[in-house]
């Protein structure tokens, strides 16, 4: 895809000055929105139809950065480090390690507009063709959306909830919400009506944006239970029929014409960096989800310094190109795709809604990103797909790939920081690996990130064998995303990187190996949980440190290694402390047929394990089918089984497969630190874990409490049979 295509969002010639007042028959709704926005601003401020340069844009909007921002002054009388009120303010954590003065989201965008106004900001597909929005157009659309929200009655510190897949509308609605003094609140598209109701009620949503009729139906079911909700806007599909207070995107954007630019500017001028602008709801694995309040300083600081720690570059040096596909309701995707994009003038291209069902690689090939982020499960799926293709390839091709990956992995493990590559490694890359990366869409990708969950060593080794280094980040919703980051200049295998500027860490209650609870401090730390004072006080101690509940250690160079979750730590009936993740990963490494493994044993006499097998996905629903993957069938054939489905293995209790799994677990037990770490019983489940099944969260993280409850009968049977 061209890097600097002139085709803008609603701007067929790439120049906003070319927009004509006549609506052509081919004009789309997006074209009309941009055109009418331009006309409205021009007629109010310009006497002639001059090109919309940076200077004329300033004149047209009659904008200036407020004096208090120009003078680097801001009002911060608050002393408390936390609040639970949406309209509350906090004392920002400015100290000698991060003395830079704070600024607002609007200032961040305004400065980006000055530098990157003519660059492509957003890319999206319409009728199988890529179209683009420049930063100037993006800013205008965000202002238009802000005025639309004000017209609909958005109150200060109330929310606009967005329920839809990643899109330009998601972006400029989010930015417009902040401009209008509201709070952006993402809702996962997989959420039930009840989950939507809880979040929309808790955040006092005045407006809810939905992308499809399916999502609209959820809101219509719960509208009567939402006293603050004034309107719903559907932006990808038309509503099934005309309904009161339900607007199409065109109608919503048209409402903005009735609000003067000066009214919006007055609101922008009053905004402070220590006010809430984003709400991120946790997945709620233990009760109702918590609303994580993030300030404007949280967002602008992390977008700038968190991304710098990952070597994300400003467009003056190299315009970063990224693909947006992970749920924007999650802070990792939102900070990486949306806010960091604005900070550095990146080009963000939107994947199709079925990205995780198989179309992501097609988008990657077309876009050719310069940096890419995926949760571990996404990288695992890419790995499994490559393995399946390799298994179906001819003998020579398969052997060439194995050879190339073997010599490359060895080089990357023995000399991880060296730019001097042996001839065999360079030859392997030229003949084989470069072609694989190109087929994946990673030919120009310099930085590949992962986070939100631990990654298996097998997956990291696999991609190192392809000459794709995966850079880890560590953080939480409560740290606005990354608090630690890896990069080409700060990398150590298996670590989560080093501290982001303006951040601090301490480990409490360390054991003999230096492992303790990770506690964090810095400009990334959240304001508090909305309406939850008790939970906020549990998370933030009297000195202002955030207690993460994660266990880890630091090496001599400051690299962080996560060892597990304190709450996930299994304490057996005999008093042994057993971290489950290393044992689960060891089982998956030993048995390539295993998709998910969950260790059980808290307050039990011995350890047991639930296993799921690798199976294919339904292309329409993305749910797991009964059919084994190519890799799983290859495992079966290798151990002497002809099984092609999970049900065959379970119903017939396939002796070859069960024996192979038993032997694999025996090998894991042999490498265990002590007998209490041995897995004594296990069972294969009929279906793999999934988001729709409830066992996985939106970022594919295992929801252990849900699994314990859902499979309680099987788990209890492990221990009922152990009679004294």
Swiss-Prot record:
PROSITE patterns: AMP_BINDING
Distribution of this protein across tissues and organs: Expressed primarily in brain. Expressed at lower level in testis and adrenal gland. Present in all regions of brain except pituitary.
GO MF annotation, one: very long-chain fatty acid-CoA ligase activity
Compositionally biased region (Basic and acidic residues): 20-30
Residues engaged in binding ATP: 282-290, 472-477, 550, 565, 701
E.C. number: 6.2.1.3
Gene3D superfamilies in the cross-refs: N-terminal domain of ligase-like
Places the protein is found: Cytoplasm; Cytoplasmic vesicle; Microsome; Endoplasmic reticulum
Catalytic activity from the UniProt record: a long-chain fatty acid + ATP + CoA = a long-chain fatty acyl-CoA + AMP + diphosphate; (E)-hexadec-2-enoate + ATP + CoA = (2E)-hexadecenoyl-CoA + AMP + diphosphate; hexadecanoate + ATP + CoA = hexadecanoyl-CoA + AMP + diphosphate
CDD domains the record matches: ACSBG_like
Region entry Disordered, spans: 1-30
Keyword Nucleotidyltransferase: no
This protein's UniProt keywords: ATP-binding, Cell membrane, Cytoplasm, Cytoplasmic vesicle, Endoplasmic reticulum, Fatty acid metabolism, Ligase, Lipid metabolism, Membrane, Microsome, Nucleotide-binding, Phosphoprotein
GO BP: any one term: long-chain fatty-acyl-CoA biosynthetic process
Enzyme class: ligase
Residue list for modification Phosphotyrosine: 658
UniProt entry tagged with the keyword Cell membrane: yes
Positions of post-translational Phosphoserine modification: 53, 56
Family note: Belongs to the ATP-dependent AMP-binding enzyme family. Bubblegum subfamily.
Reported function: Catalyzes the conversion of fatty acids such as long-chain and very long-chain fatty acids to their active form acyl-CoAs for both synthesis of cellular lipids, and degradation via beta-oxidation. Can activate diverse saturated, monosaturated and polyunsaturated fatty acids.
Protein name, per record: Long-chain-fatty-acid--CoA ligase ACSBG1
